[in-house]
Design a protein with these regions (language model features):
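Interdomain motor-coupling "hinge/lid" segment immediately C-terminal to the ATP-binding subdomain
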Residues: 2-13, 139-246
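Pre-Walker A adenine-sensing motif
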Residues: 14-32
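Hydrophobic anchor at the beta1->P-loop junction of P-loop NTPases
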Residues: 37
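Conserved lysine of the Walker
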Residues: 45-46
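Accessory nucleic acid-recognition modules appended to NTPase machines
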Residues: 65, 200-355, 360
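Short glycine-rich substrate-engagement loop in P-loop NTPases that contacts/grips substrate
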Residues: 67-97
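Structural recognition of the conserved hydrophobic beta-strand(s) that form the central parallel beta-sheet
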Residues: 125-131, 152
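Domain-level recognition of nuclease-like catalytic cores that cleave nucleotide substrates
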Residues: 393-418
């Protein structure tokens, strides 16, 4: 790796990065903080770096003070930790002053955290992205020495999706023609998710298949040196098919072995951990489980509805619950649970006194009674401040045994910010 290559990369990025058209996303950062943005591939991490760069340029920072390096650049293949110093040398051979660094997919270079810590120690401002949740692990935090703040990045919310397709929310968006327009767009978002680059693609399944294959091979098979690709593929598919129910490691192992592919519970545990590290999977615990059960029996959801849709037929009920999981996880993260002990409640946030059921349709009395009965029972054990049933389009309210239960269509719920 040579210094001249980094001079070229720095100059190239300075030419185009300020002109990139962006859908503005919520981004509230401390002026002198250093940040690590982590999320699944194509969630929009690079665009958040561009957005931050454009904010700085608007606030008077000179473009010459910006150093952006994307480590997915094929010219940087084979880069080692010893080559990082060439970035500093290249910049200081071009300009004077103290640059602000933006490093995209830096986890591609082994040992990156030591370099990032050195920059922070030397009072550089640094913004980093990566597609591996291990970047948020205690090991990395220890190496970084608490010098970086982490931000999880997800694909577009529905409101961000609407910005991307240039649909504005008018004053009374819940009613009339505007409501009909929003529901049409929600159907596409509900089915195919919110990856920024996907928004304007017509062949959405093809795009999503391509993304999944990159995640599968680059972030799973290659990174973790997996030899039994068939078992891993089956594990992903069985997780997708089990999205609405608690799933034990033993059950997953048996489902895979039933196809004739050997796969032990310990191997399944490794696969699930890899899927979590690749930011493909969200996992939540049963609030009332014992410690061992918390580790072995969880509910698993996909980080975007489009990825889940690749694996299931008749997907409506699974997609609705998956969307609820994503929406709640973004806000509550590790404070989000499900409840399963004599009663079944899809989502429970004990710190907020919030319980949420996902039910695609409320068209029959049996469904209504099941969902309401579970919420009332939970309220009897742990008094709730808010109880909700999220549907695809049904709306209303039920009061039972002193508990007010809101019935909300998902498209309204996600736009109202919970």
């Amino acid at each position: 790796m040579e210094k001249e290559l980094f001079r070229t990369i720095i100059a190239e990025s300075q030419e185009y990065i300020g002109r990139i058209h962006l859908v503005q996303r919520p981004l509230y950062l401390e002026e002198y903080g250093n940040y690590v943005f982590v999320g699944v591939r194509q969630a929009g991490k690079s665009y958040l770096l561009y957005q931050r760069i454009q904010q700085l340029l608007t606030n008077g920072v000179d473009i010459e003070d910006i150093v952006y390096v994307n480590f997915d650049d094929e010219r940087l293949q084979g880069m080692s930790v010893a080559d990082f110093d060439f970035i500093l040398q290249a910049y200081h051979s071009m300009y004077e002053g103290q640059p602000i660094f933006f490093f995209d997919e830096i986890q591609n270079v082994e040992g990156w955290a030591n370099f990032a810590r050195r920059l922070a120690n030397q009072k550089y401002r640094v913004y980093i992205t990566g597609s591996n949740a291990k970047m948020l692990s205690r090991d990395i935090e220890t190496v970084l020495g608490g010098r970086y703040l982490d931000i999880s990045v997800f694909s577009y919310s529905f409101s961000e999706y609407l910005k991307a397709v240039e649909v504005l929310l008018s004053k009374n968006w819940q009613y009339g023609r505007k409501a009909n327009e929003l529901q049409r767009h929600f159907r596409t978002y509900f089915d195919w998710g919110g990856f920024p680059e996907l928004v304007h693609f017509q062949e959405k399944r093809i795009w999503l298949n391509s993304l999944y294959n990159r995640i599968f091979f680059n972030d799973l098979v290659v990174r973790h040196k997996i030899k039994n690709e068939d078992a891993l593929r089956l594990c992903v598919r069985r997780l997708a098919e089990s999205v609405k129910q608690p799933c034990s490691l033993n059950r997953l192992s048996n489902l895979i072995k039933a196809t004739g592919t050997p796969c032990s519970p310990s191997t399944v545990m490794e696969y699930v951990r890899y899927l979590q590290e690749s930011c493909l999977l969200i996992s939540i615990d049963n609030y009332v489980s014992k410690f061992v059960e918390k580790e072995t029996i969880k509910k698993h959801y996909f980080v975007d509805n489009g990825l889940l849709h690749l694996f299931i037929n008749n997907p409506n009920t699974s997609l609705l619950e998956n969307l609820c999981a994503i929406t709640l996880y973004k806000k509550y993260a590790k404070g989000l649970y499900y409840y399963n002990k004599n009663i079944e409640v899809d989502f429970y946030v004990p710190d907020e006194g919030l319980a949420v059921q996902a039910s695609y349709q409320m068209s029959d009395g049996e469904t209504i009674e099941r969902e309401v009965k579970a919420l009332v029972a939970l309220h009897g054990l742990h008094p709730l401040k808010r109880a909700m049933i999220i549907t695809y389009e049904d709306e209303g309210e039920i009061v039972r045994d002193g508990l007010r239960i809101e019935i909300k269509p998902a498209w309204k719920w996600v736009l109202e910010g919970l």
